[in-house]
């Protein structure tokens, strides 16, 4: 995830990587993801293909 650009990719357990935009990350404050961080999300059809939405960091 690139904090400066506000987007990155999620690698699901199966299937291709999914694009994720900072607006899709749930929560307050600065929205970012760390490499290797476990998350839950839903896959949705975006303008340029499948992408992650309603992304939440796992506790």
Curated annotation (Swiss-Prot):
Residues annotated as domain CSD: 1-55
A GO CC term assigned to this protein in UniProt: cytosol
Swiss-Prot/TrEMBL keywords: Activator, Cytoplasm, DNA-binding, Stress response, Transcription, Transcription regulation
SUPFAM superfamilies listed in its UniProt record: Nucleic acid-binding proteins
Gene Ontology molecular-function annotations: DNA binding
Pfam families xref list: CSD (PF00313)
Chief localization: cytoplasm
Induction, as annotated: In response to low temperature.
Protein name: Temperature acclimation protein A
Source organism: Pseudomonas fragi
């Amino acid at each position: 995830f690139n904090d400066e650009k506000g987007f990155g990719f999620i690698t699901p357990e199966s299937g291709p990587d999914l694009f994720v935009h900072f607006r899709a990350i749930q929560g307050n404050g600065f929205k970012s993801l760390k490499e290797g961080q476990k998350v839950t999300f839903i896959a949705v059809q975006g303008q340029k293909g499948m992408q992650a939405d309603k992304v939440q960091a796992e506790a």
